[in-house]
A protein has these predicted regions:
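Charge-dense, helix-prone N-terminal extensions
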Residues: 1-168
């Protein structure tokens, strides 16, 4: 049987994603639009502890719990820790420059190390759009955090110049 001929080209069907409210979920908090799209939050850039703590407090669970543990681990591991919110994520540095960043996204937290390709062992995740040598991890729960390994990476990355810092 020959194929039916039509004068109109077929048009692809475009479906809008279903909108869900927090009430339809299992009692979970509604994620900010930026977390759903995979982009960093729209938190304003600001230096100091207070803006970072406010950024972390704005995250829904489990991202907030993960970010709080990473922040506490950084404070315990690195004397003279400096904090800042930049590009919608919390940034951490020691001395002259930023060493690593942490940001909440849908389903996980990104913990990315500047010059992470030089760390031993090299962290497993190569993020898109964060530089060729940036590496990190993307824990989905607090249980996914290997705190001993993360602390070791924090020490290693803090021992070399960070982004925006002077050469040592």
């Amino acid at each position: 049987m020959p194929a039916r001929k039509t004068d109109k080209p077929s048009k692809p069907t475009v479906r809008k994603p279903a909108e869900r409210t927090a009430a339809e979920g299992k009692g979970s908090a509604t994620l900010p639009d930026t977390m759903i799209t995979g982009k960093a939050s729209s938190a304003k850039a600001a230096d100091g502890d207070k803006p970072v703590f406010a950024y972390i407090a704005s995250l829904p669970q489990p991202q907030r719990g993960i970010a709080e543990r990473i922040d506490a681990l950084a404070a315990k591991t690195l004397p003279g820790l400096q904090r800042s919110v930049k590009w919608g994520m919390s940034y951490y540095g020691v001395g002259d420059g930023w060493c690593f960043c942490c940001g909440g996204f849908a389903g996980h937290v990104k913990l990315m190390f500047v010059n992470g390709a030089a760390l031993v062992p090299v962290p497993p995740v190569t993020p898109v759009g964060m530089g060729k040598s940036t590496r990190g991890v993307e824990p989905e729960s607090v249980a996914d955090l290997d705190e001993r390994q993360i602390a070791e990476w924090m020490k290693q990355v803090a021992a070399v110049p960070g982004v925006g810092g002077k050469k040592r």
